[in-house]
Regions:
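Conserved phosphate-donor/acceptor-positioning beta-strand/loop module used by diverse small-molecule
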Residues: 119-138, 171
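Hydrophobic anchor at the beta1->P-loop junction of P-loop NTPases
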Residues: 33
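Glycine-rich phosphate-binding loop used to anchor ATP phosphates in small-molecule kinases
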Residues: 75-122, 127-128
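Conserved substrate/cofactor phosphate-moiety recognition/catalytic segment
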Residues: 46-92
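Small-molecule kinase domains that catalyze NTP-dependent phosphoryl transfer to phosphate-bearing small molecules
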Residues: 141-198
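Walker A/P-loop
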Residues: 42
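P-loop (Walker A) phosphate-binding loop of NTP-binding proteins
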Residues: 36
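ATP-binding Walker
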Residues: 39
Length: 198
């Protein structure tokens, strides 16, 4: 008998004194989209959902951190665990999952590494590498441009804040939205999978 999503002790190996809880299936896809503010992460995630259809869960850092918890982005903040739990639950429920956000490597890297290691299916990570000048230009067109000024945006900006181990595919600013979405659909195999009737 299978327990609630995220809790499957029958197939959870014990490593040392830590129980590793495997999530998802061999068929579920996990996609991680990272990059600086205004690098196009949310647009790419929305494009993936539009292209794929039902059965693709979008887990946005901004939605959970700012919208649900209304907390600052700090080391050890509660949103890190909430992103992890939400992704695991969706994977165990049979959804393909896109986790997207700035997700600074030093704050979110350990959580993302564990999630990647625990996922039974293929995991693909992408870093949208947009230079500061382009970030500033794009940000000026966003609804939150009045709330977040250029000084703050410069403070947030981290050039090539890549996860260790070379696990991310870097996509430059010269890649158009449709091109990026198409590439990720092909890389991950989502292009060949049917939408789920949910």
């Amino acid at each position: 008998m299978r327990s609630a999503p995220g809790i499957d002790s029958a197939v959870s190996p014990v490593v040392g004194s830590v129980t590793v809880v495997m999530v998802g299936t061999g068929e579920t896809r996990l996609v991680v989209l990272r990059g600086n503010s205004a690098s196009g992460k949310s647009s790419v995630a929305a494009g993936l959902r539009e292209r794929f259809g039902r059965g693709l869960a979008l887990i946005g850092q901004d939605n959970l951190r700012r919208g649900v918890l209304h907390e600052r982005d700090r080391p050890g903040a509660a949103n890190i665990g909430l992103i992890d739990l939400t992704a695991r639950y969706a994977l165990d429920a049979g959804f393909h999952v896109v986790v997207e956000g700035i997700l600074y490597a030093d704050r979110y890297g350990d959580m993302l590494a564990r999630l990647r290691a625990d996922h039974r299916g293929p995991t693909h990570a992408y870093y949208l590498d947009v230079p500061l000048a382009e970030t500033l230009a794009r940000h000026a067109t966003k609804p939150i441009a009045d709330e977040v000024d250029e000084t703050r945006l410069r403070e947030w900006f981290r050039p090539r804040d890549l996860l260790p181990g070379g696990i991310e595919t870097v996509i430059g600013a010269d890649s158009a939205l449709e091109e990026t979405v198409g590439r990720i659909m092909l890389d991950t195999g989502l292009a060949d999978l049917p939408a789920l009737d949910r």
